[in-house]
Amino acid sequence: DTSTTYGFLEPRGIDALVTKLAKQSSTQRYAVSGSVAAQPYAPYADARLSLIYTDDPATLAAEIGLRPVAAGANVLIAVPRSPVVFERTSTWRDITVVAPSQAVADLLSGPGRNPAEGDYLLSWMKENEDVWRRQLDR
């Protein structure tokens, strides 16, 4: 069983996507995962692909001006299989990002260089548990 995922294009790139998400005023919940969610902890390289979880992909995409595409997407928006992706989120650059453990899981199963990014983030997590684990986890 997999999440239902839709491809979109943010023509100005991932930084523009982050800016748009930070400025959007929707009450719709979302959480960014993958390369973007790894940035506050262990940046591997500039993000080229973003994964966003939300309950209503079409509405979120319209609110932030994304273009639906069949190929060449730089933004994937997924309806999560479980609401766990919305738990233990944090804020980075005024956007909601998933927990590092969720970002690792998504990166390790992602396309392109995502698995290498996942390995890099996982190594960082092992060396810096006190930084990313919340007090409730201890």
Features from the language model and the residues they span:
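Hydrophobic alpha-helical interaction segments
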Residues: 56-138
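Short gly/ser-rich loop at a beta-strand->alpha-helix junction or flexible surface loop bordering the NTP-binding
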Residues: 2-81
